[in-house]
């Protein structure tokens, strides 16, 4: 039953135009809910950027986050979003220098909500010092803590899932991490079928010959 369920979900997302990321419409990216301290206009751009991130549409994400900080120059999470858009874990790509330029603009985080502070502290680990794989693993642990701390935060679930997929590419526990990442993405789907991360992360999590049985009915 579980395998059939996964298979149906993947078919729905693969063949649904609603989830085509190369679109000019925010609605076609799906729906995300990520509360921040931003002004309303900046928040709208921020949400569009987050949805684009989950769709791997990084140029659009950069554009949206840049608009958000233009509307609200002190919007810390807008700079967080820009740094996130320079990290492409599934392709092992990262623009370390550009990301840190934007992260350096985040000053006093004590005025932010605790959740915002947690996200910013996590991304500072991602773009900290040291070997990239070590940073990736430490970031994934930080996102795991956020995921556990805020069990109703679907964005925490999504970004934790993605962090595991990034780490899985270079670890002996690859299949275990992919299954765990995929199961979390499926949980997101159950809570919000329109969330873009559910579609994309499930597909990438089970994109392996040894996991094909999870996506195909017996």
Q: Which residues does each PLM region occupy?
A:
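Residue-level recognition of tetratricopeptide repeat
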Residues: 41, 75-76, 153-156, 194-196
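Inter-helical turn/loop elements of alpha-helical hairpins
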Residues: 55-63, 72, 82-117, 121-134, ...
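Alpha-helical tetratricopeptide repeat
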Residues: 39-53, 80, 118-124, 158, ...
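Conserved structural position within tetratricopeptide repeats
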Residues: 67-70, 107-108, 147-148, 189-190
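Bacterial N-terminal signal peptides
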Residues: 5-15
